[in-house]
C-alpha cells in the first residue's frame, strides 16, 4: 500500500497539500498474474446486456490499458474483435456509458470507470478517478497532493476535499481481487444467466468462496424458472466458474 509524508517542506507546494509516496504493487498487478481491484458496483453494472452486447463489453474489458484504464479502437475494429455487427457495438457502448462503466475520452478512445475496476496503488487509482470525472465534464476540485514518484501535483477527486479524507480512504480501502480469466468465463452469457451469476457472487460466503442455497431460492430471487437456473448452473460449471460440492452447495473458483 502507499504510505505518506505530511506536511511538505515550506515553499514546495500549497500548505493544504501533502507529499504522497506512490508505492507500486509491481508484478502483483502488472505481471502475468495481474488482478483488478473490483468494487461490488461492477457486478451490478453487468445487468442489462444482451448476449451479443455482452461480447462487446467483455472485449473492451479484456483490452483495457491498465495504467490509463482506457480502451483504444474504432467501432469497426471492436465489431471485428467481438465478432458482432457495428450496430451491436454502438448499442453496447451506449449502454456502458449509461451505466457509468465507460466515458468517452476522444474519438476511438473510452475510459473504464476506475471506481468499478482499477489497478495500481491507491494514489494511482484516485488519479484515474479524477481523470474519469474530467472525461464526464465534471470540474475536479478536491485536495492537492504531490506524487513523490513523479513530482506531479495531483488534484484529487471531489470526494477527497481534504488530505485527511484521502488518508482515511486509503487506510480503509477494500476491494475484491478479480482475475482476467473471469472476463472470458462470462463472455457470451445471456442477460438471465448473468443475473443468476451476479446473485450468487453477491450472496456467497467470501471467506469460504461458497454459495449455499437451493435452485428454488435462486429462481425466486431472479424471477426465472427452475429449469433456467439449472441450465445456468451447468454453464457456470462448464466455464469453470464454480463446482458443485453437494446439493445446494457450490464452491466458487
What residue ranges belong to the model's regions?
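Short recognition helix of helix-turn-helix/winged-helix DNA-binding domains
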Residues: 1-73, 128-138, 143-209, 216
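Winged helix-turn-helix DNA-binding recognition segment
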Residues: 47-52, 63-119, 191-192, 203-253
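DNA/chromatin major-groove-contacting recognition/catalytic segments
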Residues: 121-128
